[in-house]
């Protein structure tokens, strides 16, 4: 065979070997499948100022007219993600508004402190590729995914407890504002007419403080398919009345820290509490007929539970306001509404675990609408239903964790007000009481019942 022939054969053999190696070599590692998981929510009600805020400054300078609402001003909402990812998306809400609201100048970045943003972390947020979005009355809108370049390792313990600053500008007048009154978290805004300031990372750009959240009602993160969310659904005792301002020591916060210590960045516990909320009432709720406790549990179930991403468990603590002089509901009516709510959750979210939480005591409460004997008898009857009816997949026994056997009311050490100091109302536990509640939840009940598929 000629030299040329040998060369040709060697070339063909080399190609064959390369083809074989290409066929047998391992494929490049594919990025792990991910899903959206809700990382934070602020259940909306309103319109402002209807609600039950805690430690809220006088907002008349920022909002001279509740009817006009925000006017050409910017907001910087401070929120604490319960799970981290390299991509996020935001939901802006006009659920309780009466006019279309246009938002622009929307940014998300890492909070530095106060209203300052860590330099260089602000990222512009778009909606359908645009830098502004107009949301109709009664509606909400999800943003496009936004890359959080500053989140290099979502599993890093250095991110635990860190907060995001979500900034946006209201163009023109908003009209009545959708809000969450009892944030127990300081956020910031500009004065009317200040224009779009969301890009400004300095703290001087946002001179007004608030302890409420406006318009922003949900934040999702992209997370591995093994990640999941737990929704704490309830009233002021879930919302955190009497806990400490900026302390993140409501019972869902305590539960979240326990789970994170065991599971790391795989589980999110989000708070869907609204102060004054009821299971049954009010029968009629609208921006024109608001109630400080927001729409009934059934009326807000879609927005605050069923529409959320990656949910595996719902813990439902509610009913004491139904049995107050503001509610006057029967035990049977609350039981029926709870059964219906659980059925809706299971129909829309197959495999989701629904945990019933026993109601904490209110006997002897100083609040005029609470604390009387008939309310306590109804509370005991509902607690027996929660424990024994079989409607729920498990029970979080907050009654046993907080009740003083000697008096039937809250344990004395749980009464002192840890938001503003002074005497508590014997209805809402304080910081220590919420810690006891968060510690009373069996972590084994927090495991998903069913695996979630990637979208």
Give the positions of each predicted feature.
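Alpha-helical scaffolding within the catalytic cores
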Residues: 74, 214, 252, 292-308, ...
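Oxyanion-hole/transition-state-stabilizing segment in secreted/luminal serine hydrolases
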Residues: 239, 243, 281-333
């Amino acid at each position: 065979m000629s030299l040329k022939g040998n060369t040709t054969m060697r070339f063909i053999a080399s190609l064959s070997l390369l083809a074989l190696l290409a066929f047998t070599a391992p494929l490049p590692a594919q990025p792990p499948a991910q899903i959206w998981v809700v990382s934070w929510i602020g259940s909306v009600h309103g319109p402002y100022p209807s609600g039950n805020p805690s430690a809220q400054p006088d907002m008349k300078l920022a909002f001279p007219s509740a009817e006009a609402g925000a006017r050409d001003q910017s907001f910087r909402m401070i929120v604490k993600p319960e799970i981290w990812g390299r991509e996020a998306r935001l939901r802006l809400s006009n659920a309780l508004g009466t006019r279309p609201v246009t938002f622009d100048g929307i940014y998300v970045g890492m909070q530095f402190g106060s209203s300052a943003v860590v330099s260089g972390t602000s990222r512009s947020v778009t909606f359908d590729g645009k830098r502004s979005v107009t949301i109709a009355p009664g509606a909400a809108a999800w943003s496009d995914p936004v890359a959080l370049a500053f989140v290099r390792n979502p599993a890093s313990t250095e991110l635990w407890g860190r907060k995001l600053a979500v900034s946006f500008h209201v163009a023109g007048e908003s009209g009545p504002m959708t809000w969450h009154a009892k944030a127990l978290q300081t956020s910031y805004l500009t004065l009317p007419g200040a224009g779009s300031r969301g890009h400004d990372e300095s703290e001087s750009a946002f001179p007004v403080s608030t302890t409420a959240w406006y318009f922003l009602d949900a934040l999702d993160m992209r997370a591995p398919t093994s990640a999941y969310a737990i929704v704490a659904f309830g009233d002021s005792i879930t919302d955190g009345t009497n806990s400490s301002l900026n302390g993140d020591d409501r019972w869902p916060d305590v539960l979240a820290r326990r789970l994170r210590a065991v599971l790391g960045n795989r589980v999110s516990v989000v708070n869907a509490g609204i102060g004054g909320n009821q299971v049954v009432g009010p029968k009629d709720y609208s921006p024109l007929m608001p109630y400080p406790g927001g729409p009934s549990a059934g009326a807000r179930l879609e927005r605050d539970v069923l529409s959320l991403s990656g949910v595996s468990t719902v813990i439902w603590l509610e009913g004491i306001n139904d049995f107050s002089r503001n509610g006057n509901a029967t035990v049977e009516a609350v039981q029926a509404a709870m059964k219906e709510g659980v059925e809706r959750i299971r129909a829309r979210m197959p495999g989701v675990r629904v945990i019933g939480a026993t109601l904490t005591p209110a006997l002897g409460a100083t609040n005029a609408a609470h604390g009387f004997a008939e309310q306590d008898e109804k509370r005991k009857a509902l607690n027996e239903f929660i424990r024994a009816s079989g409607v729920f997949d498990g029970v979080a026994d907050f009654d046993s964790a907080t009740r003083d056997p000697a008096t039937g009311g809250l344990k004395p050490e749980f009464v002192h007000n840890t938001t503003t100091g002074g005497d508590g109302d014997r209805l809402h536990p304080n910081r220590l009481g919420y810690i006891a509640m968060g510690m009373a939840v069996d972590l084994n009940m927090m495991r998903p019942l069913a695996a979630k598929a990637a979208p």
